[in-house]
Amino acid sequence: RALATGAEIIIMLHPDYQYTPKLIHSIAYIIANGLYPVVCASRILGKGARKGGMPLIKYIANRFLTFFQNILLNQKLSEYHTGYRAFSAEVLRKINYHANSDDFVFDNEMLAQIFWHGYEIGEVTCPTKYFAEASSINFRRSCKYGLGVLRVSLQYRLARWGIIRPNIFQPQTNYKK
């Protein structure tokens, strides 16, 4: 909907109160000034994830998944699992996000699509807070998400090698301004 209203920068901020909205201006500035077309706020860069209360098991899973994604996607992000991201309208018009999952792995599919189309992703450090009222996915859905992340990353690598052609890596053809 943001694209339909003419937005040039679209910010996704999970509504679980774990991330500060105080970085919105800085993140938008990076995109508006052409430094990066996509920016992710990283809980890992500033080493604040554990200090902010991230459960140890989630931290370990984050590091494990990020390690394998960096290898399979041939990138060097500090994390792929943040709920705080910003995109230029150009990027969202290009990637085929309509082909993505309707679950938590959707966000991860978007990052793989962004890399597929040759865009770079910038990162800024972001403090986070984990507390009882903050929403978090349960263990079962976390496992499903983790397997989905590995699937997307493997699809990306196999597609780069020309072995498969998943729909999510095809250009968006149904964008209407």
Task: Report the location of each language-model feature.
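Acceptor/aglycone-binding surface of glycosyltransferases and processive sugar-polymer synthases
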Residues: 1-5, 9, 21-104, 131-140, ...
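Acidic metal-phosphate-binding loop of nucleotide-sugar-dependent transferases
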Residues: 17-18
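Hydrophobic helical membrane-anchoring modules
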Residues: 26, 74, 98-177
